[in-house]
């Protein structure tokens, strides 16, 4: 997967991929299978269902952006399209909205749905790391470490170490925090936030 500096960029890239390629992938798959099995095994309703799911996702996403009033429609969308990639994207959006409203319980619930149901490793990793950060905010440090350790995708190695550093810092385990932040910085030495965390860590450790 192409490298992105932040999880937000990763999520936006995935959303763009689905919007731009979701239907074409379905059509392409049908064309390929049609050459082997014949179009008689497939009908227009399959493509139509994908189009409807895409339209419903766009509509629910727009309503969700309007605030809490759109939360119910977003939940209904997930219930109706739980077996599609659009449900995963909607859950990620709902989690972000919940975080902005300081509803960490709801945010964690949506992220857990993504972790369980997402088919792509990158999406699972994003959700798992966001869940770990929420658990830090809730003071659930051991759970946060467990969540971070569940991420096996090496593309997220730096973010895993950063989350661990945040946990250790919250626990005032300064040596472990420094080691984790340093390991994270090795994967992206341009990350100014990580550099700032290391600088602040030195102050905290001496305080």
Question: Where on the chain are the PLM-derived regions?
Answer:
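Soluble extracytoplasmic domains of inner/organellar membrane proteins
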Residues: 91, 99-207
């Amino acid at each position: 997967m192409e490298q992105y500096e932040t999880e937000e960029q990763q999520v936006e890239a995935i959303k763009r991929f689905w919007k731009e390629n979701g239907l074409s992938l379905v059509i392409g798959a049908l064309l390929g299978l049609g050459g082997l099995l014949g179009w008689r095994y497939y009908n227009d309703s399959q493509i139509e269902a994908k189009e409807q799911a895409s339209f419903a996702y766009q509509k629910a996403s727009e309503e969700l952006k309007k605030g809490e009033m759109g939360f119910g429609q977003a939940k209904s969308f997930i219930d109706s399209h739980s077996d599609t990639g659009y449900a995963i994207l909607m859950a990620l959006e709902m989690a972000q909205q919940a975080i902005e409203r300081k509803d960490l319980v709801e945010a964690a619930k949506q992220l857990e749905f993504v972790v369980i149901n997402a088919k792509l490793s990158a999406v699972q990793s994003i959700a798992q790391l966001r869940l770990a950060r929420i658990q830090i905010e809730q003071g659930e440090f051991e759970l946060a470490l467990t969540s971070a350790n569940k991420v096996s995708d090496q593309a997220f190695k730096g973010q895993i170490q950063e989350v661990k550093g945040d946990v250790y810092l919250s626990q005032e385990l300064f040596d472990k925090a420094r080691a984790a932040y340093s390991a994270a910085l090795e994967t992206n030495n341009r990350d100014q936030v990580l550099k700032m965390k290391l600088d602040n860590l030195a102050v905290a450790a001496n305080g």
